[in-house]
Amino acid sequence: MIPPLNRYVPALSKNELVKTVTNRDIQFTSFNGKDYPLCFLDEKTPLLFQWFERNPARFGKNDIPIINTEKNPYLNNIIKAATIEKERLIGIFVDGDFFPGQKDAFSKLEYDYENIKVIYRNDIDFSMYDKKLSEIYMENISKQESMPEEKRDCHLLQLLKKELSDIQEGNDSLIKSYLLDKGHGWFDFYRNMAMLKAGQLFLEADKVGCYDLSTNSGCIYLDADMIITEKLGGIYIPDGIAVHVERIDGRASMENGIIAVDRNNHPALLAGLEIMHTKFDADPYSDGVCNGIRKHFNYSLNEDYNSFCDFIEFKHDNIIMNTSQFTQSSWARHVQ
């Protein structure tokens, strides 16, 4: 018997670019005439939150360094998720120059809620996703220099050469460059890295209670302003990936506030990483996620973007989405 689709059901567009069909024991969805399997995330697929803190000193030295105010109860949202989803592992992916007492507070949080696992960025090996900055700049310089002089962007060429010469010894690394950012890029880049690891992230962190996960298990990332109201249950996602979609004035936009994958090294995120390895000015959000997904599904600008967003959207009735937009604190940016 084919299980019913969960609350995630790709919507039908007016021009029928998107449709859902079933075939024997496999369910399919399609975009623009091509079928993709609906991959199943079971009720034990781990959830992952993230908190990268620029300034741990703004918190008490013995407090959990995650914002938890009346307007922005991010820590409470995570704890609520752990309480509702007791059968799931709940990861909190963290980075920052934390005080010893703050790390102790994280450990106490893990003790109080056995399914919460605090995963420190510097405990995870992301080197397999790295590339030398010098190689990225040299490849782009060579591309410019190979063009006929009349088509060459001389200003860009000089800029690339300057950026190449400014790389400091020991910092010739794409991954390290985002450790110096401490802004959106820091958050977004390492979120992508974590979701490339997916369930393997929990195994690599060597946390008690994580050993039942397979090295290829999936993961669901949620921003800390996403509020879980009831258990999520099993979820189907197209070709093993789905993301949050914002809609403003009828215009849809893919967002990285939710990223769900059914396995590690998902091809769409690897496609985004390839762009990060190729473009000298790549953005981890618009290129690493959005353009990687577009590339994976062969989306072109000739196709209906809103329909594509319907197709790739992570939908669920038991999540109140992006609540920080109501408190002027959302990190959301809109790209098409």
Curated annotation (Swiss-Prot):
Phenotypic consequence of C210S: Mutant used for crystallization; prevents protein precipitation due to irregular intermolecular disulfide bonds
Top enzyme class: transferase
Q: Does the keyword Membrane apply?
A: no
Any Pfam family: SseK_NleB
EC number, UniProt record: 2.4.1.-
Q: Which UniProt keywords apply?
A: Glycoprotein, Glycosyltransferase, Host cytoplasm, Manganese, Metal-binding, Secreted, Toxin, Transferase, Virulence
Give me the glycosylation sites of this protein.
R24, R152, R333
Q: Name one GO molecular function term.
A: toxin activity
Its subcellular locations are: Secreted; Host cytoplasm, Host cytosol
- What is the required cofactor set for this protein? Mn(2+)
Please give an example of a GO cellular component term from this record.
Answer: extracellular region
Q: Which residues bind UDP-N-acetyl-alpha-D-glucosamine?
A: Q50, W51, F52, Y74, A224, D225, S324, S329
The UniProt PTM text for this protein says:
Auto-glycosylated: arginine GlcNAcylation is required for activity toward death domain-containing host target proteins.
Q: Write out the residues that bind Mn(2+).
A: D225, N322, S324
Explain what switches its activity on or off, per the activity regulation comment: Protein-arginine N-acetylglucosaminyltransferase activity is inhibited by 100066N compound (flavone analog) and 102644N compound (a substituted isoxazole).
Q: Which residues constitute the catalytic centre?
A: E255 (proton acceptor)
For the biological process aspect of GO, one term held by this record is: symbiont-mediated suppression of host apoptosis
Task: Describe the reaction catalysed, as an equation.
Answer: L-arginyl-[protein] + UDP-N-acetyl-alpha-D-glucosamine = N(omega)-(N-acetyl-beta-D-glucosaminyl)-L-arginyl-[protein] + UDP + H(+)
Where is the short sequence motif DXD motif located?
A: 223-225
Annotated effect of mutating R333A: In 3RA; abolished auto-GlcNAcylation and reduced activity toward death domain-containing host target proteins
What is the protein's known function?
Protein-arginine N-acetylglucosaminyltransferase effector that disrupts TNF signaling in infected cells, including NF-kappa-B signaling, apoptosis and necroptosis. Acts by catalyzing the transfer of a single N-acetylglucosamine (GlcNAc) to a conserved arginine residue in the death domain of host proteins TRADD and, to a lower extent, FADD: arginine GlcNAcylation prevents homotypic/heterotypic death domain interactions and assembly of the oligomeric TNF-alpha receptor complex, thereby disrupting TNF signaling.
Question: Which NCBIfam families does the annotation name?
Answer: PRK15384.1 (NF011911)
Q: Hey, which family's this protein in?
A: Belongs to the glycosyltransferase NleB family.
How does the record comment on the protein's domains?
Answer: Adopts a GT-A fold and acts as an inverting enzyme that converts the alpha-configuration in the UDP-N-acetyl-alpha-D-glucosamine donor to the beta configuration in the N-linked (GlcNAc) arginine product.
Name of this chain's protein: Protein-arginine N-acetylglucosaminyltransferase SseK1
